[in-house]
Regions:
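Bacterial Sec-dependent N-terminal signal peptides
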Residues: 1-26
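A broad, structure-centric signal for solvent-exposed, well-ordered loop/edge residues
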Residues: 8, 66-68, 144, 156
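Generic alpha-helix signal with a bias toward terminal, lower-confidence helices
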Residues: 13, 54, 69-73, 156-161
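N-terminal "domain-start" segment
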Residues: 23-135, 167-170
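Compact beta-sheet-dominated globular domain cores
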Residues: 137-170
Length: 170
């Protein structure tokens, strides 16, 4: 009798651990977040854009600039690190260091072609995400999320500053 109970508990524990791991790595994809004429503020926990009067945002987009709600850009304690030469799938935990808040001199996610998440092509004047660049965001509640910018253009009308990205909590 005890062996059957032990097996049931082990099976239940295993199922719970599997579901917790799947939940932690659930990936959300956001398409065409419009940052062309205004700053678009985004709350990673709710998965929604929020108004500019809200303090409940983690990351914001303004044309090619990415902001975090910390330091000079906001009242939150959000920080970010830019990982290079990796993939979304390879990032399974937050890095030990490299997290920054925005400052007046420098953004947590560097700006300018080749410095941060994108490259500018002078021949056709396009903006393209650099493969292998992953943002890791530490929210003000202490949660970590990885984020990959997939596109800077609206796929239906090719308008610029319409971000598509995917993210998941670590």
């Amino acid at each position: 009798m005890k062996a059957a109970q032990f097996k049931w508990i082990s099976t239940a524990a295993f199922a719970w651990l599997c579901s917790a791991a799947l939940y932690a790595q659930e990936t959300k994809t956001i398409n065409n977040l419009d940052a062309s004429s205004k700053t678009a503020y985004f709350d990673l926990e709710t998965g929604r854009e929020v108004t500019d009067t809200s303090d409940d945002w983690d990351i914001a987009f303004n044309r090619t600039t990415v902001l975090v709600n910390g330091g000079s850009s906001g009242k939150g304690q959000v920080t970010a690190a830019l990982l290079k030469d990796t993939s979304f799938e390879q990032v399974t935990k937050q890095p030990a260091n490299g997290f920054k808040a925005d400052s007046d001199q420098e953004k947590a996610i560097p700006t300018g072609s080749g410095n941060g998440w994108y490259e500018y092509n002078m021949a056709d004047h396009s903006i393209s995400p650099i493969p292998g660049r992953i943002l890791v965001i530490k929210s003000s509640s202490g949660k970590y999320a990885k984020l990959e910018i997939l596109s800077y253009y609206n796929k239906s009308n090719y308008n610029s500053a319409n971000y598509s990205f995917r993210y998941s909590f670590l």
